[in-house]
UniProtKB/Swiss-Prot annotation:
The gene is ccsA. Required during biogenesis of c-type cytochromes (cytochrome c6 and cytochrome f) at the step of heme attachment. Belongs to the CcmF/CycK/Ccl1/NrfE/CcsA family. Signal peptide: none annotated. One of its GO terms (biological process) is cytochrome complex assembly. Keywords: Chloroplast, Cytochrome c-type biogenesis, Membrane, Plastid, Thylakoid, Transmembrane, Transmembrane helix. The lineage of its organism: Eukaryota, Viridiplantae, Streptophyta, Embryophyta, Tracheophyta. The chain crosses the membrane at residues 15-35, 44-64, 71-91, 96-116, 141-161, 223-243, 258-278, 284-304. This is Cytochrome c biogenesis protein CcsA. PANTHER family: CYTOCHROME B_B6 PROTEIN-RELATED, HEME EXPORTER PROTEIN C. May interact with Ccs1. InterPro entries: Cyt_c_assembly, Cyt_c_biogenesis_CcsA, Cyt_c_biogenesis_CcsA/CcmC.
Length: 319
């Protein structure tokens, strides 16, 4: 009972702190750097990480196995993984973290919702999960999901900012064209100079935006590369585990199939990044597609309850 109380306490404290941290992140995006907010932000992140870590440790001690046996535990570990990945761009550019931070509160909030009430009770592992490969395979896959989701979010942000820039530039050019059709030459020259001056000012104002686009592209590539490495290790370790448990390295189980699709999507992303002739928007589109594919891979099998991996979403009741 005391373990469950501490687990419940750590869960809700971490969720509350993450909510405050994201609010501070959003404030720092609008307002210039404030020392007090930066200090609170750093302390909040450390405290959140400590609470989630304490929750996982308590769950591990109480259950007697690494807490990755069901969907609830994997969501908590995914939230913890989000925090780890979130810290990588934090030390370089704190504003990038405001894009990836909501992933932590989303998974944390979803895990603490009433949907997983029964799963919060630790249960006996099914025979297939009673293996040393549980920690290796599942932890690598969850870390991969966290890294790939964070990198994909950065790519989505890149597309949004780029799209806004294109609309603004198109509006300036269209205005100049319309003016040239309805005014005389002298007025046209004056209007052109005004518009060009405005465009120059517009470029100066949005110089930060272009810098942010470059940073988003660079960090999304780095984080996705890290996630791709974790995903490859997770798939390989899962194949070895499958051979020990079921006598075959690969069975084209729905989970395995979607994991392969995910791996292929991000392999295409990395291949596009090696081509210097292609714009960053091309790879960002692929990463955005990968964002949806990951959620299908992660939740699809568990919620539908199909395939050999579906046991992770159900409770084993002892008789």
């Amino acid at each position: 009972m005391i373990f469950f109380t501490f687990e419940h306490l750590f869960n809700h404290i971490s969720f509350s702190i993450v909510s405050i941290v994201i609010t501070i992140h959003l404030i720092t995006l609008v307002v210039n750097k404030i020392v007090e907010l930066d200090d609170s932000l750093e302390k909040g992140m450390i405290l959140t990480f400590s609470c989630i870590t304490g929750l996982l440790v308590i769950r591990w001690i109480f259950a007697g196995h690494f807490p990755l046996s069901d969907l609830y535990e994997s969501l908590i570990f995914l939230s913890w993984s989000f925090y780890i990945i979130h810290m990588i761009p934090y030390f370089k550019n704190k504003k990038l973290s405001a894009i990836t931070a909501p992933g932590a509160i989303f998974t944390q909030g979803f895990a603490t919702s009433g949907f997983f009430t029964q799963m919060k009770q630790s249960t006996i592992l099914v025979p297939a999960l009673q293996s040393q490969w549980l920690m290796m395979h599942v932890s690598m896959m969850i870390l991969a999901y966290a890294a790939l989701l964070c990198g994909s979010l950065l790519s989505v942000a890149l597309l949004v900012i780029t799209f806004q820039n294109n609309i603004s530039l198109f509006g300036k050019r269209k205005l100049l064209l319309n003016e040239s059709l309805f005014i005389d030459k002298i007025q046209y020259v004056n209007e052109k100079n005004n518009i060009l001056q405005g465009t120059y000012l517009f470029s100066l104002i949005n110089f930060y935006r272009y810098q942010l686009i470059e940073q988003l592209d660079r960090w999304s590539s780095r984080v996705i590369s890290l996630g791709f490495l974790f995903l490859t290790m997770g798939i390989l370790s899962g194949a070895v585990w499958a051979n020990e448990a079921w006598g075959s390295y690969w069975n084209w189980d729905p989970k395995e199939t979607w994991a392969f699709i995910t791996w292929t999507i991000f392999a295409i992303y990395l291949h596009i990044k090696t081509n210097i002739n292609l714009k960053s928007e091309n790879s960002a589109i692929v990463a955005s597609i990968g964002f949806l594919i990951i959620w299908i891979c992660y939740f699809g099998v568990n919620l539908l309850g199909i395939g050999l991996h579906s046991y992770g979403s159900f409770i084993l009741k002892s008789t």
